[in-house]
């Protein structure tokens, strides 16, 4: 009886520890190809980041959303893995995901963006990093 109780307590404790590990961490989203919110966030992050890069003349644009992970905080962190390329739109113009298409000769880069959206729906790019082309 004592060993059965100890086993139940041990297994229960392991389940609680596993739950605590998941809570607060990033969770992968399997519907990232179908959810327009993720594409909107990808374009927001890419255009915001590229507009801030010194010496850059054209916006980058999203070629493909490869992976999406979310983390619930006081709002939501979205970690997106993207394929991006330089677009046909100059930085002096206004970025539009519909008109700023990837330049046919541009190299594609894989980038990871973290976008924070607070409870009021305001967004900011926390980080944006690309692998060397």
UniProtKB/Swiss-Prot annotation:
GO terms of molecular function: cysteine-type endopeptidase inhibitor activity
Stretch forming the signal peptide: 1-18
Residue ranges of domain Cystatin in the record: 34-118
Role, per record: Inhibitor of cysteine proteinases. Inhibits host cathepsin L (CTSL) and S (CTSS). Modulates production of various cytokines and chemokines in lipopolysaccharide (LPS)-stimulated mouse dendritic cell. Suppresses maturation of mouse bone-marrow-derived dendritic cells (BMDCs).
Top-rank lineage group of the source organism: Eukaryota
UniProt main location, coarse: secreted
Tissue localization of expression: Salivary gland, midgut and other tissues.
Keywords assigned by UniProt, alphabetized: Protease inhibitor, Secreted, Signal, Thiol protease inhibitor
Descriptive protein name: Salivary cystatin-L2
Induction comment: Blood feeding does not affect expression levels.
PROSITE patterns given in the database record: CYSTATIN
Record's subcellular location: Secreted
GO cellular component, one term: cytoplasm
Protein family (similarity comment): Belongs to the cystatin family.
